Amino acid sequence: MLHTLHRSPWLTDFAALLRLLSEGDELLLLQDGVTAAVDGNRYLESLRNAPIKVYALNEDLIARGLTGQISNDIILIDYTDFVRLTVKHPSQMAW
């Protein structure tokens, strides 16, 4: 399943998101959700321990001036890759 986090993790039920993640799921951080990828924050540590791949939309990182602050554990993608993820995962959950 593809999970998309478009809101700030501080404004989301992040604990519920973590509970619903399963091995093999993928999480895409976009819009304000990219703040979860900033190195050193508590949400990133939880994502590192989850059995998933985590992506961030590079355009949203650039728009927020965060490109130099993102953890190396996060896979940066563009809109074409975003489309590929949505095609790969017929089931999606938006947060």
Swiss-Prot record:
<keyword id="KW-0819">tRNA processing</keyword>
<dbReference type="GO" id="GO:1990228">
    <property type="term" value="C:sulfurtransferase complex"/>
</dbReference>
<keyword id="KW-0963">Cytoplasm</keyword>
<dbReference type="GO" id="GO:0002143">
    <property type="term" value="P:tRNA wobble position uridine thiolation"/>
</dbReference>
<dbReference type="InterPro" id="IPR007215">
    <property type="entry name" value="Sulphur_relay_TusB/DsrH"/>
</dbReference>
<comment type="similarity">
    <text>Belongs to the DsrH/TusB family.</text>
</comment>
<dbReference type="InterPro" id="IPR023526">
    <property type="entry name" value="Sulphur_relay_TusB"/>
</dbReference>
<comment type="subunit">
    <text>Heterohexamer, formed by a dimer of trimers. The hexameric TusBCD complex contains 2 copies each of TusB, TusC and TusD. The TusBCD complex interacts with TusE.</text>
</comment>
<dbReference type="InterPro" id="IPR027396">
    <property type="entry name" value="DsrEFH-like"/>
</dbReference>
<protein>
    <recommendedName>
        <fullName>Protein TusB</fullName>
    </recommendedName>
</protein>
<comment type="function">
    <text>Part of a sulfur-relay system required for 2-thiolation of 5-methylaminomethyl-2-thiouridine (mnm(5)s(2)U) at tRNA wobble positions.</text>
</comment>
<dbReference type="Pfam" id="PF04077">
    <property type="entry name" value="DsrH"/>
</dbReference>
